[in-house]
């Protein structure tokens, strides 16, 4: 495929998807990356250096990533034209090369695209936002036992109120929808019908089941003990409540789960280990308490878009903040790994910020590719650098006797501890 601005590496091969949706990964895979806006200029080169070092150490030159820069955000407006924030060829390349990674992207000012991150997820149907949350020993935390937190969140990415189906108060569209609801549907629960913004919350059986299926399969593949469906079904019975019901259906129909003590909780035997996997549900507001009071009781979380946003950031705060929180957006075939924090433009180009989020997202990427030896080295390097208290400013200011490192120096410290 020919591209207008993207330079395809001269050496390197594509990752391909097999019929069973497993990956066929060559020894020199081409990986598209989006540098990112703001601090993307600092963290992306460090991530690439750390990943290359881990791959070299793990495979002694037998494997090597061929990095291919693709463009989105402010850099795309410089490379293409000022109105092109998300070029079609970037979407094509990410889809075509299967596995990619991105830095943080800014939200364009003005109309058109509300969020580049949401646009990428929707246009590539990356319906799972996967966020593992764990504590690295030595990372400053506001809670007493951050080590009890070891969860993986599966957040539905394509539906819920994030679908963006809403209309401004006073607009003809909002008034038309409100009129239809009150006059045609007999709705009497809208307290103020004038000057009222209105939105739609789509939650489908198909969208729910494919998300929960991914979470259950992850629990099986990674020897996890439970999957918790987090919802607000006590209030929103036909959307969030349906999410819970459809989730249990997947566990029963596709994984052979049976009622536990009369239900509604269920359990099934992991076919790979023989251990029981418990499938349970928790109301979203109670879950925000539980992650503080009893985090050790939770393992894999499957939830809708808005709940997942709240939960993943709240959990990240318990283990040291979003500076080191990794994430991935997945479809059945395409995987895009990402820094989960913002662009922090005031720090851009200062070689100051923590590159941990993007580096640990790259660790997830390597594991996804089956390159577990290299992924393990990144975890080892991260643990080593933090244990030695050689850290960036966000950790250094909260740790006694720590050595302050720049962004690039922190990457070098990780490499040294591999």
Swiss-Prot record:
Please provide, in alphabetical order, the Gene Ontology terms of the cellular component aspect for this entry: extracellular region
Q: Which organism is it from?
A: Pseudomonas aeruginosa (strain UCBPP-PA14)
Which keywords label this protein? Glyoxylate bypass, Magnesium, Manganese, Metal-binding, NADP, Oxidoreductase, Phosphoprotein, Secreted, Tricarboxylic acid cycle
Pfam families under this entry?
A: Iso_dh
Give site residues, Critical for catalysis: 162, 232
The record's Gene Ontology biological-process terms are: glyoxylate cycle; tricarboxylic acid cycle
Protein name, as recorded: Isocitrate dehydrogenase [NADP]
Q: Where does D-threo-isocitrate bind?
A: 115, 117, 121, 131, 155
Reaction equation(s) it catalyzes: D-threo-isocitrate + NADP(+) = 2-oxoglutarate + CO2 + NADPH
Enzyme Commission code: 1.1.1.42
Name the source's superkingdom. Bacteria
Q: SMART domains under this entry?
A: Iso_dh
**Needs which cofactor?**
Mg(2+); Mn(2+)
The cofactor note reads: Binds 1 Mg(2+) or Mn(2+) ion per subunit.
User: Which sequence positions carry the modification called Phosphoserine?
Assistant: 115
- Description of how the protein assembles with itself and partners: Homodimer.
List ligand-binding residues for NADP(+). 106, 341-347, 354, 393, 397
């Amino acid at each position: 495929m020919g591209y207008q601005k993207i330079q395809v590496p001269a050496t390197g091969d594509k990752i391909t998807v097999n019929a069973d949706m497993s990956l066929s990964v060559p020894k020199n895979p081409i990986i598209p990356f989006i540098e990112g806006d703001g601090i993307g200029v600092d963290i992306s080169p460090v991530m690439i250096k750390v990943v290359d070092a881990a791959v070299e150490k793990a495979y002694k030159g037998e494997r090597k990533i061929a990095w291919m820069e693709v463009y989105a955000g402010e850099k795309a407006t410089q490379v293409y034209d000022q109105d092109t924030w998300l070029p079609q060829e970037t979407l094509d390349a990410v889809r075509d090369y299967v596995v990619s990674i991105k830095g943080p992207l800014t939200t364009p000012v003005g109309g058109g695209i509300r969020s580049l991150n949401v646009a990428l997820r929707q246009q590539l149907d990356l319906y799972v936002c996967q966020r593992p949350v764990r504590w690295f020993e030595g990372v400053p935390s506001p809670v007493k036992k951050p080590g009890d937190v070891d969860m993986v969140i599966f957040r539905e990415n394509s539906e819920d109120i994030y679908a963006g189906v809403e209309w401004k108060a006073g607009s003809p569209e909002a008034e038309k929808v409100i009129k239809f609801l009150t006059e045609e549907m007999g709705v009497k629960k809208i307290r103020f019908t004038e000057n009222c913004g209105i939105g739609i919350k789509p939650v489908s059986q198909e969208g729910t089941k494919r998300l929960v299926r991914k979470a259950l399969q992850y629990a099986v593949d990674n020897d996890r003990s439970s999957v918790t469906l987090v919802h607000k079904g006590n209030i929103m019975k036909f959307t969030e409540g349906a999410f819970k019901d459809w989730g249990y259906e997947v566990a029963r129909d596709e994984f052979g789960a049976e009622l536990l003590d009369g239900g509604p909780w269920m359990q099934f035997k992991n076919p790979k280990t023989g251990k029981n996997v418990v499938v349970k549900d928790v109301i979203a507001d109670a879950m925000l308490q539980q992650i503080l009071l009893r985090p050790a009781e939770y393992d894999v979380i499957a939830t809708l878009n808005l709940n997942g946003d709240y939960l993943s950031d709240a959990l990240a705060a318990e283990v040291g903040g979003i500076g080191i929180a990794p994430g991935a957006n997945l479809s059945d075939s395409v995987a895009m790994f990402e820094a989960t924090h913002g662009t922090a433009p005031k720090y851009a180009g200062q070689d100051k910020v923590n590159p941990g989020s993007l580096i640990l997202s790259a660790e997830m990427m390597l594991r996804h590719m089956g390159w577990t030896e290299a992924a393990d080295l990144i975890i080892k390097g991260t643990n080593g650098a933090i244990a030695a208290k050689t850290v960036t400013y966000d950790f250094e200011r909260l740790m006694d006797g720590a050595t302050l490192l720049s962004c690039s120096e922190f990457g070098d410290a990780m490499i040294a501890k591999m």
